[in-house]
Amino acid sequence: YVLHGNQTYPGGLIRCGDAPQLLFYKGKLPAEGARMVSVVGTRKSSDYGKKATEQLIRALRPYDPVIVSGLAYGIDIHAHRIALSLGMRTMAVLGSGLGNIYPDVHLKEADAMQEKGAVVSEYFHYESPQPAHFPKRNRIVAGLSAATVVVEAGIKGGAWITASLANDYGREVYAVPGPWSAPTSRGCHQMIASNLASVLDHPEHLARDLNWLEKKPLSAVVIPEFAQPVAQALFRHMAPMHINDLSRVLCMPIARLHGLLLEMELNGW
């Protein structure tokens, strides 16, 4: 578990006034600054909704986000499954304890996502799922991410709660438009009409709005140990340096520095 205020407590969530003081988890919590998107929707998803979910997550894959959802039937579990199939990180927020995965038919997905992502809950280990838990857990789904995408929704339901909470938290909220006569898209259309959500007519618009200009986050860059002294000196200087100046700063002979720089270049630096 992680306590509110701890360094590893999710950054997006800590900025919410009603965030849980204690968060239980299995797996790996995302590092500070990780890109996170919540993907939610109706439990009675259509083929259109499933296809839209897959297209969305596939398009976001190059930006390496964590896909957050609630492990429920319908859009939630489809979002988790697509992320897992693409080797992406995904996080499930439960309305029960970690020792009482609900629905239990999704236990396989809950276990699989712990390799790169996590399963989280504010409830004690064997807490059973209660009707009141699910609207409450939606604040965590909304609070974790920079944006919430509603793929399909009826005129009421949990997706509405999550979208409203995300809006209250000042996060981006999107709704995917659907066939005008489809009951599973009526909620999305109403969210758009009431200005609760922006139209998401192409997945790249989300990446643009969130300023994901580079497709690799900084956290993905690993500096080899041999290159760290040079990299640290350059980062501190924050400008190009002549090799003589770099040699002086590092107290390193120029001949040795030449060899080190050549090795860095051969390794893609």
Feature roles, as predicted:
Residues 3-269:
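Glycine-biased, small-residue-rich flexible motifs in mid-sequence functional cores and linkers
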